[in-house]
């Protein structure tokens, strides 16, 4: 089925729905210039990129943030949540928007998908920035008996993969569950739009759509073991946060990218684009401009 586009303009952004195989993907753009695809993670939406979008638009880029399939204002398909399938949909969405080549920035689960996108479509992805995650199939599997300060960033990987039980326990209690995450994963929680994300994941199908990326981890690992046989050749920037993954994004990509650099943003938690937007952009913008 040929992709189609619905355009809805309001606020400072252009909101579009791109239909891929009959399913809508919500895309939000600002500015004009070289396109930069911004992929959020769990449990967030495109809104996590709002500060980055404004800054990149002012610097002459066209940032395009998405709601991943199954989340936010995008449709909620029954399957297709492994990173290869998600990357293919986003690549087709960018093509439908008129962009055959673009730069990519991914956070959290969005980092997993950004890596798959760069590996599967190397001629399309000019530069790749990855932040605040490790990638299943590239990183070593974490220890089950981890100390509490590590386990707080790990336990949900197993819980979210369970079939049906998370929804049964959390439905109607989304606020308590998600606030637990935001409280413990952030260092500057007051800067994070927690209520926006709670509303998004409390919407019908929101929980299942987010958990689906975790339930697809076995297939994503299988794919990534194949991807790891060839290193990325485009420039790659890995950004960590001092009070979250620290240098883990860089460590994950060592040996998997030819042209790799990394940085750790101090005094910051997991939600780096909201907690420390100025510092994040100070590293990201020169990289996208080709000055790093």
Annotate each PLM feature.
Residues 28-73:
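Conserved HGGG/HGGXW glycine-rich cap/lid loop of the alpha/beta-hydrolase fold
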Residues 40-43, 201, 275:
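Conserved residues at beta->alpha junctions
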Residues 47-50, 54, 88, 115, ...:
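Surface-exposed alpha-helical interface segments used for non-catalytic interactions
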